[in-house]
Amino acid sequence: MTRRPPRFWLRPTRSIAARLLRPFSFIATTLTRRRLRQPTFHASVPVLCCGNITTGGTGKTPLTLDLVQRLRDRGHHPHILSRGHGGRERGPIGVNPNRSTPRDVGDEPLLLAQSAPTWIGADRAETARLAISQGADCLVMDDGFQNPTLHQDVSVLVVDGVTGFGNGCVLPAGPLREPVPDALARAQAVVVMGDDRHNLIPTFPPHLLTAQARLVPGPEIRTLQGRRIVAFAGIGRPEKFFDMLRDAGVAPIRSLPFPDHHFYTPRDIQRLEALSRESGTTLVTTAKDAVKLPFPFRTQVKVIGVELLWADPKSPERLLDLLFSAS
């Protein structure tokens, strides 16, 4: 049901397949470096980017939401910029959480728009100008680490602590969008999500602000204790959501992974409803998936939000201090 990455991408040693594909990785790296040398627009307000260099989910959207809320708590008026992956609109346009649809603007922007004004557009510079004209005093980019059109005062590289950088190779030989040294040279901070199983943190350059955090379910998880649930998710790494439920003591009797940014079809909905009726269970999904579910089916599904738990509570505040000192 999901498109799983090749196994050799995640092996610590480079396989024969990876070695055979390396010439194509060299071409991809050359093109990326050339694109990153394009002229950059400097916005009149601070710009923070939460991005990654691997395919699949790393937790950058929960990080974006966490930092946006902290900016609001400081009295700022942050606006969020997103590419709008999966949507038809090219932008720049504002996302209306009550009127915009996932097929128009994408699923992540709809989720982000529930927390702060959110704009989508392929041209980040043009989108930034529009957001600033509408009152933004700082901008937070959800993804866009490899987008050169808008200068980033602070670039935060988000790394999954379990998978790390995989086999260390660039697409298609590995999961990376660019070489790790290139990314670290542009970043000002690195946030490792989850256990640092590859002991990456000590290897990062000392000038980078490094932090560690993990994703935990929201308080609504308590209502599921002792209940039989069927969990489904169409995110970058659905198994992370299922594992999070198990760690919270809510083990699904069945887990259904869907591709990232998946649009649920009538057939999908019928299947999920049938599973719920047959087993007498509660359907559970993510907030990102919930925005794509049609009414009234959405009311039949329990939505579990995700929160960020920082290893050092001072880390996010240091990151925001860095943003305003750099701009």
Swiss-Prot record:
Looking at the UniProt record for this protein, which Gene Ontology cellular component terms does it annotate, in alphabetical order?
plasma membrane
Q: Would I find RNA-binding among this entry's keywords?
A: no
Q: Where is this region: Disordered?
A: 78-106
Q: Name one GO molecular function term.
A: ATP binding
| Catalytic activity, as annotated | a lipid A disaccharide + ATP = a lipid IVA + ADP + H(+)
Arranged from A to Z, the UniProt key words for this protein are:
ATP-binding, Kinase, Lipid A biosynthesis, Lipid biosynthesis, Lipid metabolism, Nucleotide-binding, Transferase
Q: Which domain of life is it from?
A: Bacteria
Task: Give the protein's recorded name.
Answer: Tetraacyldisaccharide 4'-kinase
